[in-house]
Amino acid sequence: MGKYTKISIKVPDVNRSFVSNNYKYSNTNVIKENISLLNNIVKNYSKFMNTWGEEFEIDNSVISGFIATESGGKNAPPNKFKATGLMQVTPDTVWETIVKWDNFVEVPLSDKSIKFFNKSIPSSKKFNSKTPPSSAVRNEILGALENNSEFNIAIGTAVLRWLLEALKENGIANINKVMVSYNAGYYAMRKKVTNNPTTEQLIDNKNIPKESRGYLLKMLGVNGFLDLWFKNNL
């Protein structure tokens, strides 16, 4: 038995292809490019994914899919929302995940996780739930997220687990809801995404940003990243 709620993943969960830049994911060249992308992510980051995937009980297929979708496997610089790195995490998300972990997750952060986070961002030792991080602390976190790939993957994977536990209903950790919330924000989505919807239902939900609905297809559609992972035994 694992520590956390078990995740149920059906791949593909929807019989649609993701469309981006006029290319369908049924396009042979796009499929080859995405298989190559996943292989490169495994080659470059499997050690970190294995370590933190095991810690937070998230399969490498899911972590790789998020990295591929969020950053294309590149250590991306901060965007206008201050999201950065392989898993496009923001400083505020780091702070919130650490200080509010116990509000949603029954299993406390392990000593291993706390020690690693404290080493990566020393200011985390002084985090508290009542005081958001200052500009100086945000910059410290931003630097760690941008320059430390293991920290980015570790905290990104922790965020996935936090969301899985926060959004579970009737003991089910719904990966669809997690994907939408990771992309558009937990607090923005928690009232718009209730019960345990299928990917198809979420894609057709006009209350969810178009980008987030495309995000779902990119991960869970036919020839999406999770589908390609399992088809090619990565």
Regions found by a protein language model. Give the residues of each.
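Hydrophobic (often cysteine-bearing) scaffold residues that line and stabilize catalytic clefts
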Residues: 45, 59, 152
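A short, structure-level motif marking secondary-structure boundaries and short turns
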Residues: 33-35, 47-48
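Non-catalytic cell-wall polysaccharide-engagement segments
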Residues: 1-26, 37-40, 54, 96-234
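N-terminal low-complexity, intrinsically disordered targeting/assembly segments enriched
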Residues: 34-37, 60
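Amphipathic, Lys/Arg- and hydrophobic-enriched alpha-helical face
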Residues: 44-54
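Acidic (E/D-rich), amphipathic helical modules within compact regulatory domains
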Residues: 78-85
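Short, functionally critical alpha-helical segments immediately adjacent to catalytic or ligand/cofactor-binding
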Residues: 57-74, 86-97, 156-158, 178-183
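Hydrophobic side chains within well-formed alpha-helices
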Residues: 45, 62-63, 215
